[in-house]
């Protein structure tokens, strides 16, 4: 039996909890834009007034306590120095390995040089009472269990180390289970056609039906009439809402905020001491590592949009080149007539020869700060939507030929650079069901394949725009247009071979739009079902995210059953808006892009650290839109040990050079004074985060890259010092073990 289980009645969140969660949501949404900017404190705990109030509160609890001798003994035991155990190598699949007392001895690794460790003695739970510490540990434990559950159901990633600790807390044996891992398409072999269709699986003829926003799979028509779907893991909305309300309450609890804030401050300070003591030893490791430096270790642009994957000079050069070659070619169609390229520019009253990067006006500047609407206008070269349709769209008069050529040129630059990869996003809007067919036809017909690129699908959250123009009757139709064609291609791949081949190259789904737009709607059991959402108002971020996740979960189970590649859910999150966005992502997203607002919530930031959720940060993009570069939390997150990578977002708007990813690294290195080891660690994180295949990750990171800590690092390929990897792993285990120690005291 597990050592610690929540009682059955606690699992069902009562009305009081739900009401509390609604109050928390309301307080997060109210004055969202201004409150945090006006406050001089990143988190409330830094405020000296609240600090003194907390100390007085703790003293009051201590003086009023009339506990028995047993309680005083338990309190004393909780306040003495605790020697924490850290799992090292896996000596057994059923038991966590331990070391001698943490303070008197240090862990040793065969491949890690000796280095100086930071040792903390004294009260590990200082600042909170023992009772509060137990409450905190219970809450963090359950939060990690919630994430683990949603990741495993959808074949997304959850690290081994916290999973081991969770099983240890439960009193259960941890067993490695690779069946929960995502499946990516292997790399194309030399001489193999990446668009071959002769190896597609056979059609199954299953029936599909969307019910309450989720696609259900039925073996035959009779099963549809009886409502007996195939036994796939379908989502449970009530359970999701209960879990969401629990997390809403958790991130608002005072003791949890105090404890997590103190732990994060400790992590930051500990890293700075580690750097001061071991920076030269890390550098010595890297200097002794032959044929590997920052330039030739693999790095992936984990967040980039295909429509802006080129820099402004590249786009300008291509426009001029196309005019030289295709001036008399019919390239554009209006209601009146078809236009040649020459006639189109004449209609716009301009000549390509006269264009400059300034007149092209696609670069974000001071005018776009806090103005996402103006930023979207930058996608129109020279402010002309006709040029955007011609050069940056897949569905136009020339079938997206120019856009395909630009992407191929960007891919050729990546191949030439050799050690850089990218994950461009292509858009599916959900306006009509034939979008998938058109996009896959564009992809296959133009033979868009690059060994240094993997692809993702982004879904803009613009239902309100389509509904106001009467393109869609309800939100359920948008979900149907997004997911039904993918399910059909999974069940009957030979019916649409182009889409089936295209899906092999897709690794995940992204949810994109301006997060600072508030919907004011809290997702609850009272929310309309997707087919009932006929309002012109946009659903909330959580509403979008849940139904995307729910369909991806069912889709992944079906594709895994068929031996096909699966998809990850990797949304934009935390760039702006309410903290509920990040809370939702913690539950159901494999990884996120941006994550700036984590600095406003110590609880969520600490949970992201414990679960090692990857975050693709884009400081140059944020600098033009939401946050000045010097205030970016990138360095703070890196020091604390969050799993962050660098990405470009939109090179056309934010970068100047031919290698925008290197530009991103170079500026971060200069502004934040990053060491070579820091940059290589971020690069290694990007490869772990991305959707390239297992075979390629083995080649880029080493045979044991799935192992966590120094055992999974091959310095010959990653150029990350083993000292750094050992420090990260031991610090991570220390924090996880604190939770385990806190729960032991409840027995």
Curated annotation (Swiss-Prot):
EC primary class: hydrolase
Cysteine disulfide partners in this protein: none
Function: AMP deaminase plays a critical role in energy metabolism.
GO cellular component: cytosol
Family, as annotated: Belongs to the metallo-dependent hydrolases superfamily. Adenosine and AMP deaminases family.
Taxonomic source organism: Homo sapiens (Human)
Active site: 594
Pfam families in the cross-refs: AMP_deaminase (PF19326)
Taxonomic path: Eukaryota, Metazoa, Chordata, Craniata, Vertebrata
Catalytically driven reaction(s): AMP + H2O + H(+) = IMP + NH4(+)
Protein residues bound to Zn(2+): 303, 305, 572, 649
Entry-annotated residues carrying Phosphotyrosine: 216
The EC number(s) this enzyme carries: 3.5.4.6
Cofactor section: Zn(2+)
Record's protein name: AMP deaminase 1
UniProt modified residues of type Phosphothreonine: 81
Modified sites of kind Phosphoserine: 85, 441
Oligomeric form and interacting partners: Homotetramer.
PROSITE patterns, per the entry: A_DEAMINASE (PS00485)
Cofactor comment: Binds 1 zinc ion per subunit.
GO MF assignments: AMP deaminase activity; identical protein binding; metal ion binding
Binding site for substrate: 305, 374-379, 575, 650-653
Alphabetic keyword roster: Disease variant, Hydrolase, Metal-binding, Nucleotide metabolism, Phosphoprotein, Zinc
Outcome (variant: residue 633 to H): In a colorectal cancer sample; somatic mutation
Disease affiliated with this protein: Myopathy due to myoadenylate deaminase deficiency: A metabolic disorder resulting in exercise-related myopathy. It is characterized by exercise-induced muscle aches, cramps, and early fatigue.
Biological process terms in GO annotation: AMP metabolic process; GMP salvage; IMP biosynthetic process; IMP salvage
Pathways per UniProt: Purine metabolism; IMP biosynthesis via salvage pathway; IMP from AMP: step 1/1
């Amino acid at each position: 039996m597990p050592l610690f289980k929540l009682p059955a009645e606690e699992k069902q969140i009562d009305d009081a909890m739900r009401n509390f969660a609604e109050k928390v949501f309301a307080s997060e949404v109210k004055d969202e834009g201004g409150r945090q900017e006006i406050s001089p404190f990143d988190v409330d705990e830094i405020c000296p007034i609240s600090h003194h109030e907390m100390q007085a509160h703790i003293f009051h609890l201590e003086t009023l306590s009339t506990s028995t001798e047993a309680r005083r003994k338990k309190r004393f035991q909780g306040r003495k120095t605790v020697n924490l155990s850290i799992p090292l190598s896996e000596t057994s699949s059923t038991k966590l390995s331990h070391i001698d007392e943490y303070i008197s001895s240090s862990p040793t690794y065969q491949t890690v040089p000796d280095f100086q460790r930071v040792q903390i003695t004294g009260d590990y739970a200082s600042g909170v009472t023992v009772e509060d510490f137990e409450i905190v540990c219970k809450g963090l434990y359950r939060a990690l269990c919630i994430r683990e559950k949603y990741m495993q159901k959808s074949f997304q990633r959850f690290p081994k180390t916290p999973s081991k600790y969770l099983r240890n807390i439960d009193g259960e044996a941890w067993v490695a289970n690779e069946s929960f891992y995502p499946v990516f398409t292997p790399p194309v072999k030399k001489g193999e056609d990446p668009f071959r269709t002769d190896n597609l699986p056979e059609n199954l003829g299953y029936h599909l039906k969307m019910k309450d926003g989720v696609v259900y799979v039925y073996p035959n028509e009779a099963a549809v009439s009886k409502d007996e779907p195939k036994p796939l893991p379908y989502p449970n909305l009530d359970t999701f809402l209960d879990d969401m309300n629990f997390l809403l309450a958790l991130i608002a609890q005072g003791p949890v905020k105090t404890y997590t804030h103190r732990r994060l401050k400790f992590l930051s300070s500990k890293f700075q001491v580690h750097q001061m003591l071991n920076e030269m030893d890390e550098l010595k490791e890297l200097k002794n590592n032959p044929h590997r430096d920052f330039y030739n270790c693999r790095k992936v642009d984990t967040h980039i949009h295909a429509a802006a994957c080129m820099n402004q000079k590249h786009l300008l050069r291509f426009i001029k080149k196309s005019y030289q070659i295709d001036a008399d070619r019919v390239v554009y169609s209006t209601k009146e007539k078809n236009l040649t390229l020459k006639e189109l520019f004449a209609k716009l009253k301009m000549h390509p020869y006269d264009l400059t990067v300034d007149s092209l006006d696609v670069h974000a500047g001071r005018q776009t700060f806090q103005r996402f609407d103006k930023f979207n206008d930058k996608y129109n070269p020279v402010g002309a939507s006709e040029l955007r349709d011609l050069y940056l769209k897949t569905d136009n008069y020339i079938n997206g030929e120019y856009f395909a050529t630009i992407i191929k040129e960007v891919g050729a630059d990546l191949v030439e650079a050799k050690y850089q990869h990218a994950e461009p996003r292509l858009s599916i809007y959900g306006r009509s069901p034939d979008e998938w067919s058109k996009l896959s036809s564009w992809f296959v017909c133009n033979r868009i394949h690059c060994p240094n690129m993997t692809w993702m699908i982004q879904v803009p959250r613009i239902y309100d725009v389509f509904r106001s123009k009467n393109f869609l009757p309800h939100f359920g139709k948008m979900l149907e247009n997004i997911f039904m064609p993918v399910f059909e291609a999974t069940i009957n791949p030979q019916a649409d071979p182009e889409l089936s081949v295209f899906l092999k190259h897709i690794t995940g789904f992204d949810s994109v739009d301006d997060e600072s737009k508030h919907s004011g709607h809290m997702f609850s059991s009272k929310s309309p079902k997707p087919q009932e959402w006929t309002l012109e108002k946009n659903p909330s971020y959580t509403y979008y995210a849940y139904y995307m996740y729910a369909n991806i979960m069912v889709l992944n189970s079906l594709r895994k059953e068929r031996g096909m590649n699966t998809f990850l859910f990797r949304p934009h999150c935390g760039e702006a808006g309410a903290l509920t966005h990040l809370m939702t992502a913690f539950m159901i997203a494999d990884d996120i892009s941006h994550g700036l607002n984590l600095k406003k919530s110590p609880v969520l930031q600490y949970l992201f650290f414990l679960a090692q959720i990857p975050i693709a940060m884009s400081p140059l993009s944020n600098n033009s839109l939401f946050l000045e570069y010097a205030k970016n939390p990138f360095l703070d997150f890196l020091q604390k040990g969050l799993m962050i990578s660098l990405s470009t977002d939109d090179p056309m708007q934010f970068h100047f050079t031919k290698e925008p990813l290197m530009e991103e690294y170079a500026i971060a290195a200069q502004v934040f004074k990053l060491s070579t080891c820091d940059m290589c660690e971020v690069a290694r994180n990007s490869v772990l985060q991305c959707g390239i295949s297992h075979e390629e990750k083995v080649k880029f990171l080493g045979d044991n890259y799935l192992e966590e800590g120094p055992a999974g690092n091959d310095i010959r390929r990653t150029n990350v010092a083993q000292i750094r990897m050992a420090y990260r792993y031991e610090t991570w285990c220390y924090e996880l073990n604190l939770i385990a120690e806190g729960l032991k005291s409840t027995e």
